[in-house]
């Protein structure tokens, strides 16, 4: 014969919430008719309560990028409930909600100490926690919502501790583990998720940044903040693209954009893969950064000037003079340009007034940046275009003089192929290199835009990355960890 024992689940759940104890019931079997053996009369009944319990999603830390005026973040909650060892949904209607713990400031301080971070508590006027999260009978998951206002945030990392509580039903338990949201105005790499190799960037007179890249008729992108880019067309069309001889097999590589004497000047490499004696440098101009660009033909003829593989040009001004640096794995060279930047400055006999070798044969993709009394010559080394086998990376040397000598941090001359590493590959990014001219934001931070393959999608080509350039105590530049990032705080433009 079965004996029925009835429980009040509400009272049991209430006690479990207070004590989290394991309960037992002591039973004794008695009879007025028969004699019960003493050894069989006592029973200890363990009470296993498989109560429904609601928790936040498994992740204890959420990463949130706030790049829109209003960002809505969904937080998943889930209910754990079983019947006869099988998972079931809720067997009652109930409500719960997200709250900010009363000791939020202390939690942020403890988190920072444990994780060696410097996050601030998210300002209360910058977010709104959604209303009650309602579960109907049968539900096993429901979403909560947090709305964050970008205008209330500065460019830094914030932390928001969260807990889940019930709002009236005593038959449901709630996981009181604190979860955290790391919130920032940040970007995700790649900033251009399609092939746009050898990027060059300029801040134009209209307040927009324009990016030009290798490929077709030179794709052009536009951005207000270096993060969100929109494709707007190409610098050339099929009718206006360069047509100077030799034409056969020519492609436009490694564009370099400048603003000279009220004109947008686009230098480009007129090249054939694998034919170093047939690579030259051309120039085109436009009144607008969007084009249309009018081609002016050859600026540097590799054969005529005596530099094989004449590509990867870089324009720089110093002391009222205009210079062009260029070269690829046959030495980096410098020459002086005319005042309009459209021709090589020459002696009366037709020879260049300047032709100087400044780096050895290990380098290409020159980029020069002046800072703190030094000229920093960035370059790329290794193989650029072999997918997962690419060994491309960015290196640097520096000099007190624009024309060198450029040396590494140990004094080794770049003419002898010495260098200091700036950024290399990792498990996510392969072949990072050919950086654009460095851009300084309104807080004085320098930013580097460059290309790389995605290790898990090399077929996408060389996509575009953005990273903050850091400087060590001796004044040498580097990307954090000497590797591309997946994300970071956005540049500050007010």
Regions found by a protein language model. Give the residues of each.
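Carbohydrate-active catalytic/glycan-binding domains of CAZyme proteins
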Residues: 184-494
């Amino acid at each position: 014969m079965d004996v029925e024992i009835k429980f009040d689940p509400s009272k049991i759940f209430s006690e479990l919430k207070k004590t989290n104890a394991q309960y037992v019931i002591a039973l004794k079997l008695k009879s007025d008719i028969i004699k019960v053996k003493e050894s069989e009369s006592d029973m200890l009944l363990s009470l296993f309560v498989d109560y429904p319990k609601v928790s936040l999603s498994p992740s204890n830390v959420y990463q949130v990028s706030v790049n829109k005026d209003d960002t809505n973040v969904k937080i998943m909650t889930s209910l754990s409930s079983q019947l006869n060892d099988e998972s079931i949904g809720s067997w009652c209607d109930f409500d719960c909600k997200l709250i900010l713990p009363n000791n939020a400031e202390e939690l942020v301080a403890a988190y920072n100490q444990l994780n060696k971070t410097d996050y601030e508590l998210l300002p209360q006027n910058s977010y709104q926690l959604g209303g009650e999260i309602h579960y109907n009978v049968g539900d096993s998951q429901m979403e909560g919502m947090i709305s964050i206002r970008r205008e209330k945030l500065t460019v830094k990392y914030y932390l928001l501790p969260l807990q889940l509580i019930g709002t009236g039903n005593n038959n449901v338990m709630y996981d009181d583990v604190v979860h955290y949201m790391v919130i920032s105005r940040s970007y995700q790499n790649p900033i251009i998720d399609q092939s746009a190799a050898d990027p060059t960037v300029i801040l134009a007179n209209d307040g927009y940044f324009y990016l030009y890249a290798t490929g077709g008729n030179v794709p052009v992108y536009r951005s207000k903040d270096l993060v969100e880019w929109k494709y707007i067309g190409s610098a050339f069309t099929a009718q206006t693209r360069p047509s100077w001889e030799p034409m056969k097999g020519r492609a436009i590589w490694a564009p370099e954009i400048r603003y000279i004497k009220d004109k947008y000047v686009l230098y480009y490499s007129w090249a054939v893969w694998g034919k170093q004696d047939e690579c030259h440098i051309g120039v085109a101009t436009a009144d607008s950064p969007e084009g249309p660009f009018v081609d002016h033909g050859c600026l540097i003829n590799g054969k005529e000037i005596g530099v094989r593989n004449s590509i990867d040009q870089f324009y720089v001004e110093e002391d009222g003079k205009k210079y062009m640096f260029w070269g690829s794995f046959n030495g980096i060279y410098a020459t002086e340009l005319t005042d309009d930047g459209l021709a090589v400055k020459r002696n009366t006999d037709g020879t260049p007034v300047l032709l100087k070798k400044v780096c050895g044969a290990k380098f290409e993709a020159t980029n020069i940046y002046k800072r703190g009394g030094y000229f920093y010559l960035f370059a790329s080394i290794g193989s650029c275009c072999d997918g997962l086998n690419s060994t491309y990376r960015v290196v640097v040397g520096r000099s007190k003089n624009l024309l060198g000598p450029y040396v590494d941090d140990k004094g080794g001359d770049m003419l002898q192929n010495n260098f200091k590493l700036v950024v290399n590959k990792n498990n996510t990014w392969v072949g990072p290199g050919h950086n654009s001219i460095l851009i300084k934001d309104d807080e004085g931070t320098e930013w580097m835009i460059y290309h790389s393959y995605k290790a898990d999608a090399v077929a996408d080509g060389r996509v575009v990355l953005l990273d903050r350039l850091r400087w060590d105590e001796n004044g040498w530049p580097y990307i954090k960890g000497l590797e591309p990032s997946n994300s970071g705080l956005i540049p500050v433009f007010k």
